[in-house]
Amino acid sequence: MTETARMYGGSLYDLAAEEGLDERILGELEGVTALLNGDAEYLHLLSIPSIPKKERCALLDEAFRGQVHLYVLNFMKLLCEKGALRELPGCARAYRLRYNEAYGILEATAVSAVPLTAEQTARLHEKLEKVTGKHIDLKTKVEPAVLGGIRLDIEGTELDGTVRNRLAGLRSSIAAATL
């Protein structure tokens, strides 16, 4: 995430939080970001310098007025005017981080070889909340290469309890013992 994205996203969060709109704006900002990420041609069109800024902003108005809160629309128009619309995903990420910080939420990803059952996911979620004392936004991911066990990534801290990791450790121990 760039410093520009951090600054713009953080500023939007401050405004939305002050107005009690932080949750609504978060949802709309992430939705608009996903939409624009899925339409590279439209995003490119909004970034062409030869098209006057006024026309590019009018395109945003036409597409999003009445669909999103005015703060989100004006934020996108501001980024468009500054030639920084491609920073929108970073801005949304910065906004999300500020939101999570304000509400005591940690993002966690559990990677396993097979899909976790609903019960396993619920138990893991409960255990993580108990251990951290924070609310956990838990996502699960399947990677057959882990072979078994679970690898947790909690905001950049990795806890690797996978079979693959244990085998790698065993391999290193055997290699060190034979030297």
Task: Label each residue range with its predicted role.
Residues 1-179:
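Elongated, mostly alpha-helical coiled-coil "stalk/stator" tethers of large membrane protein machines
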